[in-house]
């Protein structure tokens, strides 16, 4: 438990940031889940639309510090390859 006033304030701030980051991470996972569902269903149009919606959301998570840049790029690259494969 925090003892000093500054440590107590820092703990409160961390709690707030954690809640925000948890919501952002959940939002990204939701977009990824929708894309995954479209890919497994084999629905080309839905997969393309879901990918176009998911990519900016993933990259936004990078700018907000939720995901590492390389992790996001790897995810986008692999998802794009899967979408291209289903579109061909």
UniProtKB/Swiss-Prot annotation:
Name the Gene3D superfamilies for this protein.
Ribosomal protein S20
Signal peptide positions on this chain: none
Q: Which GO terms describe its cellular component?
A: cytosol; small ribosomal subunit
Q: Where is this region: Disordered?
A: 1-25
Cystine pairs annotated here are none
Write the record's keywords in alphabetical order, separated by commas: Ribonucleoprotein, Ribosomal protein, RNA-binding, rRNA-binding
- Domain of life, per the record? Bacteria
Name a Pfam family for this protein. Ribosomal_S20p
Could you tell me the Gene Ontology terms of the biological process aspect for this record? translation
* Recorded GO MF terms: small ribosomal subunit rRNA binding; structural constituent of ribosome
What family is this protein classified in? Belongs to the bacterial ribosomal protein bS20 family.
According to its UniProt entry, the function of this protein is described as: Binds directly to 16S ribosomal RNA.
Question: Could you tell me which NCBIfam families the record lists for this protein?
Answer: S20
Q: What is this protein called?
A: Small ribosomal subunit protein bS20
């Amino acid at each position: 438990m925090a003892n000093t006033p500054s440590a107590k304030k820092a703990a409160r701030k961390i709690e707030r940031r954690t809640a925000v980051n948890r919501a952002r991470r959940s939002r990204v996972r939701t977009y990824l889940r929708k894309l995954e569902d479209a890919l497994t269903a084999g629905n080309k149009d839905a997969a393309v639309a879901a990918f176009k919606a998911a990519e900016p959301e993933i990259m936004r998570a990078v700018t907000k510090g939720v995901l590492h840049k390389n992790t996001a790029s790897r995810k986008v690259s692999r998802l794009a390859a899967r979408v291209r494969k289903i579109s061909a």
